[in-house]
Amino acid sequence: MQTARLFQGNLNLAAANIRDYEKKEQRNLGVWLSLNQWLRLYDEDTRFWWTTTAPMLGRMMELIGYDQDAQQKHLLFYYIYVLPSLGRRPSPEGYPTGWNSFMTDDYSPLELSWDWGVAEGESSVRFSIEPIGKYAGTQADPLNQKMVYQLVDGLRPAFHHTLDLTLFDVFSEALTTSREKFGTRKLSLEGRSQYFVAFDLDVGHPRLKAYFMPGLKSIESNTPVSELVVKAMDACELHFGSLFMQAFRRLNSDLEAFSATSYHRPEIEIVGIDCVSPVKSRAKIYIRHRGTSFDSVCRMLSMGAKAPLDAASVASLRELWALVLGLPKDFPSDQELPSVPHRTSGVLYYFEIKPTSDAIVPKVYIPVRHYASNDLSIAQGLATYFERRGQTVAAENYVDALSDIFSHRSLDSGLGLHTYISCTFKKTGLSVTSYFNPEIYHPNRYRQ
């Protein structure tokens, strides 16, 4: 296996001549440039992904205070395990080759994020990918099934016996399908993704999370997604325990009642888990709702709740909602945002449940990708929010940092760099995360 060979030999790799960057792009890439002198890229696909995406990841870590040892460790992890899983490089004209990933709206198979926490000093870097095989989308691998298993199995040496795939296997069986089961049904170029994986780059070792999209399984089995998810949770009852199941059934009951009376029916899109011992894992149910008023957001966040939402957190959320979407202060809470006819329009939520509690932790993903003015206005709005809460470093550096990391275009030239600004309701307040599409296929990256 390629990843295993890389793991065994990474410290002895010979130096390679990587495409030179302009001096202005080199000035802040110290750890990446240092590694770049010694790492050998196995083919042009991994060369593209390393030179295009790894500098972004390195700068994101550097700008929020990761020391050089941590940066090096995580970049080596990215090089060894992740690069071979990003699929083929784009065509010379800058188009996907063989597989359109649902990870981002432009099909980039990678999403980067800064988790800012609730207060100063709580920030960390995360990223998510769709593992894509070399032959994904072809007759040899039409559903892109192979690479996710190669990646997950190959990660074992890096996780020092903490990797547990019990839940991965259960949810994979319950929520995804195979080429053999799907048969000759016609597939569109879009909507084929079934697996994402994500990594939290903590101080210690990265943490692995897996995500399952049941859309194809629903078609193959002629079963609504909601029923598939209920069956998957029931199959895990022995692993998750009674408290978890109480919370899930409460959430599911509330969703069904809301769907019966709502003009917009909430739709389950993704189920996520942590790849650790089931008793330490979480299940996260991702739901998209087409309602976009702030009142609708509050109603959705209350799904399955045993108590009302914290008033102070709701007030903070409304402030952030207005700042990043560029709404006036007097924008009515019951007014919908302008209609956007897109597959990912509306508002995305997740509901987190743990085996050790019957509590449900809600999270909202503010859909700035579709409803804000441009990426500069989003960045300025988020910086203002940070400033008002004493997160001085983030407030002062956020806009310039984005311009530095994503230098292929100006922030005020359009939307798409920010995918979401998310908020999790925690006991100490709102925990904010900003998510980014690296815009792998942006035309500016391919102009001579």
From Swiss-Prot:
One Gene Ontology term from the biological process aspect of the record: alkaloid metabolic process
The yes or no answer to whether the keyword Magnesium is present is: no
Would the keyword RNA-binding turn up in this protein's UniProt record? no
One GO MF term, please? transferase activity, transferring alkyl or aryl (other than methyl) groups
Recorded superkingdom:
Eukaryota
Q: What class of enzyme is it?
A: transferase
Which pathway does the protein contribute to?
Answer: Mycotoxin biosynthesis
Q: What role does it play?
A: 4-O-dimethylallyl-L-tyrosine synthase; part of the gene cluster that mediates the biosynthesis of sirodesmin PL, an epipolythiodioxopiperazine (ETP) characterized by a disulfide bridged cyclic dipeptide and that acts as a phytotoxin which is involved in the blackleg didease of canola. SirD catalyzes the O-prenylation of L-tyrosine (L-Tyr) in the presence of dimethylallyl diphosphate (DMAPP) to yield 4-O-dimethylallyl-L-Tyr, and therefore represents probably the first pathway-specific enzyme in the biosynthesis of sirodesmin PL.
The Swiss-Prot or TrEMBL record describes its family as follows: Belongs to the tryptophan dimethylallyltransferase family.
Cross-referenced PANTHER family: INDOLE PRENYLTRANSFERASE TDIB-RELATED, PRENYLTRANSFERASE ASQH1-RELATED
Identification of the protein by name: 4-O-dimethylallyl-L-tyrosine synthase
